[in-house]
Amino acid sequence: TPSMFKRYSGTVLNLAQGASGNNYFHFFFDIIPKIYLIKKKTRIKIDFYYVSTPKKWQIKIFKILGVLEDELINSSKNKHIFADQIISLDHPWYQKGMFQDQVRKMPKWVILINRKLFLKKKSKFKCFKKIFLDRSSSSYNHCQIFDQKKINKWIIKKDLTIYKPEKLSFNKQIHLFNTASVIVGAHGAAFTNIIFCKPG
């Protein structure tokens, strides 16, 4: 019904994409490239951004990109909207088929723009170069390590230092991965940060 619609004056960029919109990996590889393309490759002025329920860490990163919190439209609270113009972009790299196959074909420009946008924002702190990524605080149960005591012995033997990336600010995560020489851990979204590692 018309009463369900919320009206916005101006142009809205649609960045909603279901549950993956709040996933750390998909945020950097799906959503950030769309914002970059609109801001840097067009003259379109975006007034609002239609997004999946924004998390605190996302709001901070949006701010780095020049997107203010009051410019974000929460798609969970506003399922139907009207605007003068609504823009939706194709996925920047996924075409069709299995995700695992498509991610292997990730365009280099997607990685490079993330490095260009965020490497300069790193916050230096004293950290070790050989690191182990601990997923024990993850809200997801997959890729968890069950024999942690045995793994801890191995970690000590290999002179690795344990880090929980989600306990660090985004800026410190950039620095941690940028200075790392060895990174070990179970598969998880934190490995997205390898885009900030030094080449080689």
Segments (PLM) and residue ranges:
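The feature primarily captures lumenal catalytic ectodomains
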Residues: 1-200
